Amino acid sequence: HLSLRRQRQMCIRDRISSDPALLATLGPPDLLEQYADESFTGYYTENPAAVFMGMVWWNNAWIALQCVLFGITGLWPINVLVQNAMGLGVSGAVMAAHDQVDVMILYILPHGLLEMTSIFVAAAGGLHLFWSWVAPGHRSRGESLAAEGRSLATVAIGLVFALFVSGLIEGFVTGWSLPWPIKIGIGVAALAAFLIYMLVIGGRAYRRGETGDLVEYEAGTPRLLAG
C-alpha cells in the first residue's frame, strides 16, 4: 500500500510539473520561476542561523505535538502527514518544472532525513494511542489509554530532542557553503544515531520489559481490590 501511495504521489507530481495548465493553478509563472530559482534556496539563509533554527524547531515540534495530542482521534496524524506530503509534492512539482529537482533534494536531505523520520514516529505514536482504546486487550479502555498516554510522553520528549538536532542541521548546515557530501553526511549521521538509539538501545529496554510507563505507585492504583 505504501509503494502504491508513493507511486500515486509521484504521478501527481509528474503530471503537475509537465502540465502547464495545472502548474498555472499554483501561481503566476514569474512567481513560480522566482520560487524555483531563488526563494526555495533563499529560505534557508534569509534569517540569522540561530533565529531560523528556532523557527523550524518550533514549527516541527508543534507538528509532532499535534500528532501526539490529537492521535487519539485516529485521523489527525494521517491528516498531518497528508498535508505535509502535499506541500512537499507541490514544491517538488514547481522545482521539477524548472529543472531544479536536484537542488531541492540537496537542500532537503541534510536535515530532512531526521526531521521526516521524527514526524513519522510522532504520527505512529499518535495512532498507537488511538489503537490503545480501540483494542485495549485485557485492560479497560481507560486504563489502556492512560498507560499508553504516559508511555507516549517518553516518546514525545525524545522527539523534542531529535527535532532540536534536525533544527540545528537545518539552521547551521543546510544553508552553509559546505560541500554537499559533508552536509548530507551530517544528516545521515544524525539519522543513524537516532535509529540506533530508538531501535538498538530502545529495543533492548523493551525486551527487558520497559514500557516507559510509571510504576503502579507513581501512576496511582487503578482500582480498589476487595480482600
What is the predicted function of each stretch?
Residues 1-12:
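Single conserved hydrophobic/aromatic residue that forms the stacking wall/gate
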Residues 1-3, 53-54, 78, 109:
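Generic secretory/membrane-interface signal
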Residues 8, 30-36, 87, 93, ...:
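Charged, low-complexity, helix-prone segments enriched in Lys/Glu/Asp/Gln
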Residues 13-38, 83:
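Interfacial/capping segments of alpha-helical transmembrane domains
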Residues 32-55, 105-114:
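Short aromatic-rich membrane-water interface segments that cap or initiate transmembrane helices
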Residues 45-76:
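Individual transmembrane alpha-helix segments
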Residues 63, 69-227:
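Generic detector of multi-pass transmembrane helix bundles and their immediately adjacent loops
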